[in-house]
Amino acid sequence: MRYLHTMVRVTDLATSLRFYCEALGLREIRRIDNDKGRFTLVFLAAPGDERAQVELTYNWDAEDYGIGRAFGHLAYEVDDIYAACQRLRDHGVVINRPPRDGRMAFVRSPDNISVELLQKGGSREPREPWKSQPNVGEW
């Protein structure tokens, strides 16, 4: 057995792709447009690691997804937690849980999916502007 992917439903595919690809840094590795089923599947992966994938499911017709099915969060290891958070901020993403400890941060996708970022190799030295920033909203 091997892990394949985690599926998340999105309400605006273009906005979601800007978040996951441009801001977070994932890349699109496969896309399936199903005219009969009226949906699009987009598979994303971190550069250099296509084994762990996120599947964005976009239904062409409006649907109310309601509260998730006990879904927690997506998590990614990053080479530089501060650079990753700055990149997200530069794309207009709110850092809900700043990396005050130099190790962990949380943001939310356009569809309110919680995304955790963890510093590769353990904590970095805490530094400003991050170490004095409070949490913002839910994470």
How would you label these PLM feature ranges?
Residues 2-11, 29-32, 41-46, 62-139, ...:
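Vicinal oxygen chelate
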Residues 49-50, 62, 123:
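Active-site/binding-pocket entry motifs
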Residues 7-51:
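Core segments of cupin and vicinal oxygen chelate
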Residues 51-53, 114:
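Short, mixed charged/polar active-site loops
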